[in-house]
Curated annotation (Swiss-Prot):
Family stated for the protein in its record: Belongs to the radical SAM superfamily. Lipoyl synthase family.
Record SMART domains: Elp3
Protein name, per record: Lipoyl synthase
Naturally occurring in which organism (per UniProt): Pelobacter propionicus (strain DSM 2379 / NBRC 103807 / OttBd1)
Subcellular localization(s) per the UniProt record: Cytoplasm
Disulfide bonds: none
Record-linked Pfam families: Radical_SAM
GO cellular component, one term: cytoplasm
Pathway membership: Protein modification; protein lipoylation via endogenous pathway; protein N(6)-(lipoyl)lysine from octanoyl-[acyl-carrier-protein]: step 2/2
Name of encoding gene: lipA
Chief site of localization: cytoplasm
Chain residues that bind [4Fe-4S] cluster 1: C60, C65, C71, S300
Record-annotated Radical SAM core domain positions: 72-289
């Protein structure tokens, strides 16, 4: 029996991980630079209506992204395919965990219709992790990219994928005929914190995924992202940035982790805008084509502007 998303959020989702997300943890006061704008405007309501009419989800809503208001007002969104229930239960993430439903065969067509209605020129597609599928859902990613290409207009597509654990070779074969313009896979945090932050993932496996994609599809740039404020040190962040460059990663996003609820990992520290700027400058100095670094940055925030650094967008 499928588990409904609402039954596997918050405390129920993270209780069995053995990770301390105690309600007794007093939250740090949020600094002024992290105050987002309200998402409620007529333009936002129109976008939400189009998404609902086409039975689509956005990671903006599911992950409680702090930029939801800004991006929705600009008519952009990161589409989350393959449902809104994830087979993993990372204690930093607000997406529901459970047994996912079957893939919706009409989702690629619905996605293309929504993109056309919204008149988007740069589309980001991400997904829940689907360990239940033999190819990790790569074939569905490919079908969505193909549907967007069929629109026959100038449109750039970025995919932000899971790690395709145990199925990387199969996944790449599925993507081969429908490659994106940018391949994005987030490391999320430094290796020392993986047992606490990403207990079902493998740091070196994620690095290897980025390198293998770049080696097989050399003309497609790669991208990754980190959340800061979970207890990492500055040297650890710099080490990861250097390791990403050694694995031929082209673009990087760095943003502040923000706790979705009291049942998720607490924020250990709010990183200042000046620190984010230092990371940006360091990233550029070691060869990243673009580093989007700031408290409110998320992996698909200003994705079109990030890609311009590689002349992907007119």
């Amino acid at each position: 029996m499928d588990v409904q998303p609402t039954t596997m959020r918050g405390a129920v989702k993270t209780a069995h991980l053995g990770t301390d997300v105690s309600l007794a943890t007093k939250p740090l006061p949020k600094p002024e630079w992290l105050r987002g704008k309200s998402a409620s405007t007529p333009d936002v309501e129109r976008l939400v209506r189009i998404l609902r009419d086409n039975r689509l989800h956005t990671v903006c809503e599911e992950a409680s992204c702090p930029n939801l208001g800004e991006c929705f007002r600009k008519g952009t969104a990161t589409f989350m395919i393959m449902g809104d229930v994830c087979t993993r239960h990372c204690p930093f993430c607000n997406v529901a965990h459970g047994s996912p439903h079957e893939l919706a065969a009409d989702e690629p067509v619905n996605l293309a219709r929504a993109v056309e209605l919204l008149k988007l020129s740069y589309v980001v597609i991400t997904s829940v992790t689907r360990d239940d599928l033999p190819d990790g859902g790569a074939g569905h990613y490919g079908a969505c990219v193909r549907a967007l290409r069929d629109l026959k207009r100038s449109l750039k597509v970025e995919i932000l994928t899971p790690d395709f654990r145990g199925a990387v070779a199969v996944a790449f074969e599925e993507l081969r005929m429908n490659l994106p313009d940018v391949f994005n896979h987030n490391l999320e945090t430094v290796p020392r914190l993986y047992p606490r932050v990403r207990p079902q993932a493998d740091y070196h496996g994620s690095l290897d995924l980025l390198l293998r994609f770049r080696e097989q599809f050399d003309h497609v740039p790669t991208k990754s992202g980190l959340m800061l404020g979970l207890g990492e040190t500055e040297q650890e962040v710099r080490d990861v940035m250097e390791e990403l460059r050694r694995h031929r990663c082209d673009m990087l996003t760095l943003g502040q982790y923000m706790r979705p609820s009291p049942h998720h990992l607490p924020v250990e520290r709010y990183v200042t805008p000046d620190e984010f700027e230092r990371y940006r400058q360091f990233g550029l100095s070691i060869g990243f084509s673009h580093v989007e670094s700031g408290p409110m940055v998320r992996s698909s925030y200003h994705a079109d502007m990030q890609a311009r650094e590689l002349m992907l967008v007119n």
